[in-house]
Amino acid sequence: NVRFDLSGATSSSYKTFIKN
């Protein structure tokens, strides 16, 4: 599942999401 929770996602988690 692809989720875009920018309000709850941290910068590190966002970077990990981009890698995955």
Swiss-Prot record:
EC number: 3.2.2.22
Residue ranges of the region described as Disordered: 1-20
Residue ranges, compositional bias (Polar residues): 8-20
GO MF annotations in UniProt: rRNA N-glycosylase activity; toxin activity
UniProt KW keywords: Hydrolase, Plant defense, Protein synthesis inhibitor, Toxin
Protein's UniProt keywords contain Hydrolase: yes
Disulfides per UniProt: none
Catalysis performed (reactions): Endohydrolysis of the N-glycosidic bond at one specific adenosine on the 28S rRNA
Source species, domain of life: Eukaryota
GO BP of this protein: defense response; negative regulation of translation
Keyword set includes Hydrolase: yes
Enzyme kind, highest EC tier: hydrolase
Family the UniProt entry places it in: Belongs to the ribosome-inactivating protein family. Type 1 RIP subfamily.
Record-given protein name: Ribosome-inactivating protein
